[in-house]
Amino acid sequence: MAIPELAGEEGMLFARPGFNLIATANTRDRGVNEMSAALKRRLNFESVFPIPDFETEFQLVKRESGKLLKESGVPQGVPEDMLEVLVTTFRELRTGQTREGVALSPFSTVLSTAEAVSVAHSAGVRSWFLRGEAVNAEDIVHGLDGAATKDDPEDRKRLRAYLEQTVKKRREASWTAFYEARHHLS
């Protein structure tokens, strides 16, 4: 690698065995500039696809958000019924299809498992430090509002449509609470 600010031998940096660089990116986040073909030839790419199994993703979000909450001084994790709502919502919005098989408008935002962990963590911190209580549906809606709509304001409309057309029909208590908390979307 040439470093134009340095003169002589100091201006050239050569690779050595053992040197590694690891970078991550979401496949849907292309950024401003595409990588050049020359740069792509010098790199190895590994694609990690979304977790196909609900239970595996659920357990991962539960474990990782629990660790983060503990580190944040929150003595309890997110209740399983709220985690089920969160993970199901992320999966359905990510795939563009409900668990019942109904097609949804696709989101422009990447809704990764890491983002679900972040929402669970922020919901846990919010609920504990604002109310001293366990996470409820309002906390999940607040977290989703930021995560699902951060890149495109149109995604807020898609989230509202999901709540009105899909969540409204579900009869489990956690889903009813999630639907009733929809007015917390900004």
For the regions a language model picked out, list residue spans one by one.
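Conserved AAA+ ATPase small/helical "lid" subdomain
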Residues: 58-61, 65-139
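Helix N-cap and loop-to-helix transition residues
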Residues: 16, 36, 52-53, 79, ...
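A broadly tuned preference for mixed-charge, low-complexity surface segments
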Residues: 25-41, 45, 72-95, 99-109, ...
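Residue-level signal for functionally critical sites in structured catalytic/ligand-binding pockets
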Residues: 29-32, 36-42, 110-114, 121, ...
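Charge-rich, low-complexity amphipathic helices
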Residues: 43, 57-61, 65, 108, ...
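Canonical AAA+ ATPase core
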Residues: 1-72, 126
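C-terminal engagement/docking regions of AAA+ P-loop ATPases
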Residues: 128-186
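Generic alpha-helix detector with strongest preference for long hydrophobic helices that associate
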Residues: 5, 16, 20, 24, ...
